[in-house]
Regions:
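Amidase signature
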Residues: 1-134, 302-483, 487, 515, ...
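Short, well-ordered beta-strand elements within core beta-sheets of diverse protein domains
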Residues: 72-79, 145, 163-167, 284-291, ...
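Short glycine/serine-rich loop segments
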Residues: 171-300, 491-498, 504-507
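Flexible, acidic active-site loops/lids enriched in D/E/S/T/G that coordinate Mg2+ and/or position polar
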Residues: 110, 114-139, 165, 169, ...
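Enzymes and membrane/adaptor proteins characterized by extended Gly/Ser/Thr/Asp/Glu-rich
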Residues: 136-175
Length: 541
């Protein structure tokens, strides 16, 4: 046999080996996913057995004010069809009806809010407030809430940390100043996970928050109290923050809209330990949660303040001419297998745009999305001005992951199990810096090339709807669908798409390139029109 033939045989042998190894890997992955799917089903069966009988329904809503959009309420106050006091009182009454079931609102200012409303009504009645004032204060007289981890002067500001028990804010976060200057009235602050870092809302100071669609289910985190109260009709306007899906996870699980804007347009000052000096590297953002898509842009205009012109929120959008792309499954092996009701949710949206768009939606296959969790972990390690191990002690010392974990599982302590998970995660090695930076840029460039300035991506929200309380401990990576947009700093809107057969919300994410928030919101409005959007978890009369 000649040397040339020998080399050829060796190459063919290597090729066959590579093919065989690839086949084995594919089969092992299929076996893993098949097994994982049925383990997830078993988890639900077991949790359901112990929890389904404990479900408590949300009370019927009898006041039509509760169902109106924040924009509509503001217009009616302006036209004197409603008084601010009537509106605020309606939501105070509703919170008192639903919060005993939800445990969403953890600190209130009802009487002060009603007095704020009466003053507004007096100013409107005597002509002190003019039309120009309404333009500068688009939400005059409309109530809102925000999460307890953001500073609202005079309100609880513990971040769910035991060492901060009883702490109250002495100032307003920058975004709170903006929404107050727009005329909105704060009713209180809502529950969060400890230090905001978990996909369920639970902490040692205020306990766990329940889902209004099924009180035994998760509301998401970290803006879980906001989404729960909003969906139950407890508030018309909600503001959350988002470093890893914290607006969108709760919005998904509670069937409302949530928008994470283009990054670095909204000050972070007053959000937990942040000062506003974190710079452009931070993934932290602030965004609205609403029951009606029409509220997203008006609230966003307020939050971005002087940067409003960068977002083109007043530009008309013809959704038929938007270039649509979609991804059905990000193929991240750490995430639970994608269930059929979630697959059909995104395909319903795709089908709708196939019917109305000038060009059919294109399915994308972008490998980098499967690295979402690893990339987010890397960029979280680069967040400036924060240190989880110190912050969790209120910066009075530094947590010891090993000692505090042992203490938690033996004698208990001041940390939640989710915080212990975060401790253990800190012990794991961070992704390689060179790889993470390169992969982030590669993914960003691929998506920017597809989206341009007139494209959106329809993207999954989760492998399945809201799971039972604490089941997230067995599925700790299921938030990965959300975090990739924090890594890339793209704007993204969580859109409700109705309920599944269990009566739980389903939905999708709508993503655009930076500064194209108006496209996300336009598509959200179209999907709301086509599929109904928010579905109340209570009877109405």
């Amino acid at each position: 046999m000649s040397s040339v033939e020998s080399i050829k045989d060796i190459k063919e042998h290597k090729h066959r080996n590579r093919g065989f190894c690839s086949y084995v890997r594919t089969m092992l992955l299929k076996v893993f996913l098949f097994t994982r799917y049925y383990i997830d089903i078993l988890i639900d069966v077991i949790f359901g057995y112990f929890n389904d009988s404990k479900r408590v329904p949300i009370k019927k809503c009898t006041n039509p004010i509760i169902l109106e959009s924040a924009t509509s309420l503001a217009q009616k106050i302006r036209k004197r069809e409603l008084t601010s006091e009537e509106v605020v009182q309606a939501f105070v009454d509703r919170i008192k009806e639903v919060n005993p079931v939800l445990n969403a609102l953890v600190d209130s200012r009802y009487e002060d809010a009603l007095e704020d409303a009466r003053k507004i009504d007096r100013d409107i009645a005597n002509g002190t407030i003019l039309d120009v004032d309404f333009q500068e204060k688009p939400f005059l007289g409309v109530p809102f809430t925000t999460k307890e981890s953001s500073a609202v002067k005079g309100m609880s500001f513990t971040l769910g940390i035991v060492k901060r028990r009883g702490r109250r804010a002495t100032f307003d976060a920058d975004y709170i100043t903006l929404i107050k200057n727009a005329g909105a009235i704060c009713l209180g602050v809502t529950n969060i996970p400890q230090l905001n870092l978990w996909q369920e809302t639970h902490n040692p100071l205020f306990g766990i928050t329940n889902n209004p669609y099924n009180s035994t289910r998760n509301v998401g985190g970290s803006s879980g109290g906001e989404a729960s109260l909003l969906a139950a009709g407890g508030i018309p306007l909600s503001i959350g923050t988002d470093i890893g899906g914290s607006v969108r996870i709760p919005a998904f699980m509670c069937g409302v809209f949530g928008h994470k804007p283009t990054s670095h347009l909204i000050s972070t000052a007053g959000i937990a330990f942040r000062t506003g000096e974190e710079g452009e590297q931070t993934m932290v953002n602030t965004g609205p949660l609403t029951r009606h898509a029409e509220d997203l842009a008006p609230v966003l205009k307020v939050l971005v303040g002087e940067h409003v012109k960068k977002l083109k929120l007043n530009d008309p959008v013809d959704v038929k001419n938007i270039k649509m792309s979609y991804i059905v499954n990000a193929k991240d092996a750490l995430i639970s297998p994608y269930r059929e009701d979630m697959k059909q949710t995104i395909l319903r949206a795709v089908k709708h745009f196939k019917e109305i768009s000038t060009t059919p939606p294109e399915e994308l296959n972008i490998e980098g999305t499967k690295f979402a969790g690893k990339l987010w972990k890397y960029w979280m390690s680069k967040e400036s001005g924060v240190n989880f191990m110190k912050d969790i002690t209120d910066r009075t010392g530094e947590a010891n992951p090993i000692v505090d974990t042992i203490k938690h599982f033996t004698v208990g302590g001041e940390y939640t199990t989710s915080t212990i998970y975060n401790f253990l995660n800190k012990l794991l090695p961070s992704p390689d810096e060179t790889w993470a930076i390169k992969e982030t840029e590669k993914l960003r460039e691929q998506l920017l090339a597809k989206l341009g300035n007139n494209g959106v991506l329809l993207y999954p929200s989760a492998p399945f709807p809201a799971s039972y309380h604490h089941a997230a401990y067995l599925r700790p990576w299921n938030f990965h669908y959300f975090v990739i947009w924090n890594v890339l700093k793209f704007p993204v809107t969580q859109v409700p798409m109705g309920l599944n057969k269990e009566g739980l919300p389903v939905g999708i994410q709508v993503v655009a390139a930076p500064y194209q928030d108006h496209l996300c919101i336009a598509v959200a409005k179209e999907l709301e029109k086509a599929f109904g959007g928010y579905v109340p978890p209570f009877e109405t009369s």
